[in-house]
Every structure is written in C-alpha cells, then in structure tokens.
Swiss-Prot record:
Belongs to the influenza viruses nucleoprotein family. This is Nucleoprotein. The keyword Ribonucleoprotein applies. Residues 1-21 are annotated as: Disordered. It comes from the Viruses. Late in virus-infected cells, may be cleaved from a 56-kDa protein to a 53-kDa protein by a cellular caspase. This cleavage might be a marker for the onset of apoptosis in infected cells or have a specific function in virus host interaction. It comes from Influenza A virus (strain A/Duck/Australia/749/1980 H1N1). It is found in: Virion; Host nucleus. Encapsidates the negative strand viral RNA, protecting it from nucleases. The encapsidated genomic RNA is termed the ribonucleoprotein (RNP) and serves as template for transcription and replication. The RNP needs to be localized in the host nucleus to start an infectious cycle, but is too large to diffuse through the nuclear pore complex. NP comprises at least 2 nuclear localization signals that are responsible for the active RNP import into the nucleus through cellular importin alpha/beta pathway. GO terms for biological process: symbiont entry into host cell; viral penetration into host nucleus. The keyword RNA-binding applies. GO terms for molecular function: RNA binding; structural molecule activity.
Length: 498
C-alpha cells in the first residue's frame, strides 16, 4: 500500500506508541499483556479463586468486564447524572462461578470501581494502561464475532445479511481507539456511518452548532478510517465524495451500501490480532514468564505458543458438545470468525465446522440459567501449525482486487484461492450507476467483473511448524479449489443483543 510509510504497525496502535523498532514493539506489547496477567492474578487472590476456578473462561470474562466497566468514563459519568433504580454507579460486578461439593455455583459479586481501577493500575506500573483495556475489548469483540450473527443489525441499516463477513468488530465500543479501528471490518464502518447519517436526517440539529461541529469531525474521521481500508483508487475516490458531502443524506447511504457490497470482492484491509482471555496471560505470568523481557507479538507465533501450554476450562450446558465449544473459543482467540474454514482447519489440525453445525451456544451463561446441570470441560485451544495474521484483504495482482467469497475476510497469511459466487454478488449491482459517483461505480463494477474465483491470494505464503519460531520453512497447503469455506453458511446462531 502506498501509504505504508505513514502507518504505524498495529502493535504500535495497540500500545499507543509512536514509531518503534521491532524489539521495542515486542517489549511494549509484552508489557501490555504482562500487565493484564498481573491484574488477573491479583483479582483471583482478591476473590479467593482456586487454581481451577481461575482457569474458568467465564470467570475470566466477568473479571475483564469489570475492569472495562470501571474505566468506562463516559458511561460512569452518565450513570452519575442519571441514577437508575438498583444500579450503583460506583460499583461493578458480575457472576463468579465456584466449585462447591462437586457442583458449580454462581455467586454475584460487587466491587467498588475505584478499587478495581487501583488494582489495574498497580498491575500496570501505576499507569492507566489503556492499551491493555483495548486489548480486552478486542478479545470480547472477536468472541462476539465468532458467536453471534448480526443479521438484524445489517437489515436495519439497509445492508444484506449475506454481507456478514464484513462485520468484524461490530460490537467494539466507540472508545476502542486506533487499535480498535484497525480491526473493524468495512461493513462495521459503513454501518456506523449510516447510523450517523440517519440521525442527521431525522434530527435537524445533529450537524449544527458547537456539538454539530464535533459530530462533523467524527464523521470525517470515520470516513477516513473507512477510506484507508479500501485498496482501489475508485473505492477511495467514492469515500472522498461521501466525506466531503455538505449535508450527508440518502445519496451517501446509497454510496456506502454500494461500497460495502463491492468489498465482498474488492476486499478491504482489516487487521487481525490474536487477543486471548486474561486468564491465559495470568497463567503465564504466574508460572514465572516475563512477557516484557521475552517480548510478545499479537500477529506471530506467540499467541499460538501460549495456547499450546495453557489449560483453560469452560462451563458446558447439558446438551452442548465440548469440542464445539473449543472451536468457538479457538476461533475467537485467533480472530478467525471470517476466515476460510479450509485454512482454519489446516492450521488447527482438526476440522473446523460451519456455525450452523455447532452444538454449542455462547460462552457466557445467562443469570437465569440453571447451574444444577452445569458441567465443565477443558477447552482444546492447541493448534497443529501457526501462521502470520494478515492486515490485507488478500487481494491479488499488485493489491488490485481479486476474488472474494460471500463470507471470507482472511485472517491468516496463507496461500489459497478465495472462492465466491460472482452471480450472487453481481446481482446486487444492477442498474443504478448514475449520479455524481457514476464513473467510480462503473470502474468498481468493471474491476469486480474481472475478478476470478480461482485466483490465488497470498502467493507463496504458508503455515509453519510450532518449532519454527523464526518462520523459516513455510508449508504451503493445497486446498480443494472448489470447496468453499464459509463459517456462517446455513447459520442458526443467536442474534447479538447488548
């Protein structure tokens, strides 16, 4: 990409740093995950969790959510000003699961946010460590991406539910910063912009006055983030049009939906990071591993290696399949919800099945679920190989656009074709090429028509043995070219509701 020189790596965004060399980046990312680990250990001590209870992913998620809530400035301020019945704005908590007399019991805990902030800062050398918080948000976002479908959200904004592969990061909070923006899919950005434009259409004062000026700046910033994800000149030019519009309205919504559809074939660059649950970092720190000294990367071998050596448990409902629960969490850990199943299966060394065939619900347990029948099992999070995470859409021929599949946004930099139903996608592009963006639309459609499903992406890139930490011997897998690998095919997952 032409602008590569000005880009910070995503580890730099993650750690809020300016340009650093590779060693400094590895050290600062190590410092970040080490801080998460230290915080987790301290929380387990506070809550008197046994070793087994501390390795329970549901407990990890509760603790992560507590610290995110404790640092959510805007929501805290809102809660102070709008006191609601039964909600103490100064407290945070959630369900903690304990093992008692051979059964799992749920205990609702409540903590002062101030106390949680103190423990977090103490674990992070007295700093706020915003990067670590963002890291936890991205882990939750990746878990949501693997667990829920966003059909309803897509339909509400006028998009097609088959565009789900563009929705990475759709549940990330707004305060997730540059690192959060990097992992958002094209569809997520389009949806945020459409919501904003719709508000402007319905509320005359939305773009006016001092507040309106701030709104406008936010709008243009979001447009620029989305523009940066596109890799073809025509798509970027269309984004300039949307950004510069005097009074954004239905024409802009049309343009954005057009761009989102085009991203099914002319894919955008979306970053992928392996963000693991806090308990995994906690286990490593507890065993004496020094993340800062050893260095850490979210896009290399490190997360794979960490998962090879971590034993994490999960609560299992009576009719759930533990292997399926493991697959769900494995995909979340590697940000692979939108990856081709052929690639995921090869790396994992076990068949990764489409979500419609999974006998498992989400990881979190609702407060009204019966604990009597709950069991727990070990999550199998190990892999056969490792591969480098990608931040490109896998477009071929000089980063022009190439084949995409109705639902793939590649996670791993591994050679494969990206099969897609051209007829299905192109059917959405009939007619409307008039108006001020007509030449760009025509150009985009032309590029899409010339894309071939058999083109190979990530030419020559392969997976690596777990013993090959310097990535010296790529193993280039061969895939059945016709077999498409969409995780969301024939889907029956629950909707994501806040």
């Amino acid at each position: 990409m032409a602008s590569q020189g000005t880009k910070r790596s995503y580890e730099q965004m993650e750690t809020g740093g300016e340009r650093q060399n590779a060693t400094e980046i590895r050290a600062s990312v190590g410092r970040m995950v080490g801080g998460i680990g230290r915080f987790y250990i301290q929380m387990c001590t506070e809550l008197k969790l046994s070793d087994y209870e501390g390795r329970l992913i549901q407990n990890s998620i509760t603790i992560e959510r507590m610290v995110l809530s404790a640092f959510d400035e805007r929501r805290n301020k809102y809660l102070e000003e709008h006191p609601s019945a039964g909600k103490d704005p100064k407290k945070t908590g959630g369900p903690i699961y304990r093992r008692r007399d051979g059964k799992w019991v749920r205990e609702l805990i409540l903590y002062d946010k101030e106390e949680i902030r103190r423990i977090w800062r103490q674990a992070n050398n007295g700093e706020d460590a915003t990067a670590g918080l963002t890291h936890l948000m991205i882990w939750h976002s990746n878990l949501n991406d693997a667990t829920y479908q966003r059909t309803r959200a897509l339909v509400r904004t006028g998009m097609d539910p088959r565009m789900c592969s563009l929705m990475q990061g759709s549940t990330l909070p707004r305060r997730s910063g540059a690192a959060g923006a990097a992992v958002k899919g094209v569809g997520t950005m389009v949806m945020e912009l459409i919501r904003m434009i719709k508000r402007g259409i319905n509320d005359r004062n939305f773009w006016r006055g001092e507040n309106g000026r701030r709104t406008r700046i936010a709008y243009e910033r979001m447009c620029n983030i989305l523009k940066g994800k596109f890799q073809t000149a025509a798509q970027r030019a269309m984004m300039d049009q949307v950004r510069e519009s005097r009074n954004p309205g239905n024409a802009e919504i049309e343009d954005l939906i057009f761009l989102a559809r085009s991203a099914l074939i002319l894919r955008g660059s979306v970053a992928h990071k392996s963000c693991l649950p806090a308990c995994v970092y906690g286990l490593a720190v507890a065993s004496g591993y020094d993340f800062e000294r050893e260095g850490y990367s979210l896009v290399g071998i490190d997360p794979f290696r960490l998962l090879q050596n971590s034993q994490v448990f999960s609560l299992i409902r009576p009719n759930e399949n533990p292997a399926h629960k493991s697959q769900l969490v494995w995909m979340a850990c590697h940000s692979a919800a939108f990856e081709d199943l052929r690639v995921s299966s090869f790396i994992r060394g076990a068949r990764v099945v489409p979500r419609g065939q999974l006998s498992t619900r989400g990881v979190q347990i609702a407060s009204n679920e019966n604990m009597e029948t709950m069991d727990s099992s070990t999550l199998e999070l190990r892999s056969r190989y490792w591969a480098i995470r990608t931040r490109s859409g896998g477009n071929t021929n000089q980063q022009r656009a190439s084949a995409g599949q109705i639902s793939v946004q590649p996670t791993f930099s591994v050679q494969r074709n990206l099969p897609f139903e051209r007829a299905t996608i192109m059917a959405a592009f009939t007619g409307n090429t008039e108006g001020r963006t007509s030449d760009m639309r025509t150009e985009i459609i032309r590029m899409m028509e010339s894309a071939r499903p058999e083109d190979v992406s990530f030419q020559g890139r392969g997976v690596f043995e777990l013993s090959d930490e310097k990535a010296t011997n790529p193993i280039v897998p061969s895939f059945d070219m016709s077999n498409e690998g969409s995780y969301f095919f024939g889907d029956n997952a629950e909707e994501y509701d806040n």
